[in-house]
């Protein structure tokens, strides 16, 4: 017979683990440590006290850069909209190809150039205008954070698919990687049939694998060390109290609830430079299917 106390303990562990899963996803590695009190008394840059949009949905832009120390001069290597829906216990990862041909300050350019011209503020503005959405929250993560976080975790087992293995010239299956090796893995692009899109698929798959790895019972005690290693390389304007409250709604969230999509289009060359033209119908599909609650009036 299972005692009531045991049931309560099991439920508590499941809830705590699911919260950590969601929070880990929110900032890709570090926000899960909110539960351990690491943000108590710390100042969050430009905190946002009100969550815009419907109460059961949450949207922010995740940007991966070479360095978070400079506001301009660095292009984004990864751009991804993250939308969490507590009604359906789902998290959507909407990748924006970095070569997407968009308008930046009235001139056409690659979307990843926005950060080099005006930092995360201009990047946010370009994404808002390009998709016609309301968006005010962001997370900027330096790739140094990936190296530091994975190493603090003691390395990571990565399941490399047949297609990715063929592109990278390695054997498929499980590879134990260091932080530096993981970074090279998620940034690799030359061997794919379509370099940028192939890398997007790899990055989305990696996020799912990391969440599964980081939330293994044996790894949970390592999270404070992982957070301490990554914290200097992460910048956000999100209010930690809001994220903690939101995460409490995700009692049943796990890696199987993560949905990966991307803006579709086709590549073209102009002046010796490769660009990616997003199909208008793909924009409308993403807007109506995933971003309907955040559309501009």
Model-inferred region functions:
Residues 3-4, 9-297:
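Non-catalytic, solvent-exposed segments at the cell envelope interface
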